[in-house]
Amino acid sequence: LMFHDTGKLDRLGEPIMKVKLREPSAKLDAFMDWAEDVKGPVVVFSQSVGMINLAAARLDASGARIGVYTGQTPDRVRQSIIDDFQAGKLDFFLGTIKAGGEGITLTTSSTMAFFDRAWGPFRNKQAEDRTHRAGQKNAVQIVDFFAPGTVDSRVRNTNIDKWATLKLILGDDREGV
């Protein structure tokens, strides 16, 4: 998995990253090891459709019941994926942060994983809040798959700095503001 900065910014001023996916992937291997042991339905997010598709292929090959929710998912099937996940018919909901990170409820899960994070902490917080909603009965565990010294690590540190600055400006010390 290789991330390259395109030197361009999206409409929110966040760097646009180009992802080259490679197999084998240590990150995907670590995720699959973790996924074998995790209990209950799991929500998985990434910025990359390619990463979601790779994970979906691996999970499908392992016999897991999966739903994929990206910008490429037809509108007519999006709600059925959410409904199936909420009804316990799927083990994994895999989605991109942009497509699935806002406006949907995934409270049947109390476990969430991120392959990578958006540059903007608000997008990440919105994605996290898909499980932190009215109707959630359990504490939610959030797992990030990243390695030190990588772009993922840089994104993580940038988001931590952005939250710290925001808290300083607002005078708010609550987690996630």
Regions found by a protein language model. Give the residues of each.
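Structured loop/turn residues at secondary-structure junctions
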Residues: 47, 98, 118-119, 147
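Conserved Helicase C-terminal RecA-like lobe
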Residues: 1-93, 98-104, 170-177
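A short beta-strand element within the Helicase C-terminal
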Residues: 104-117, 140-144
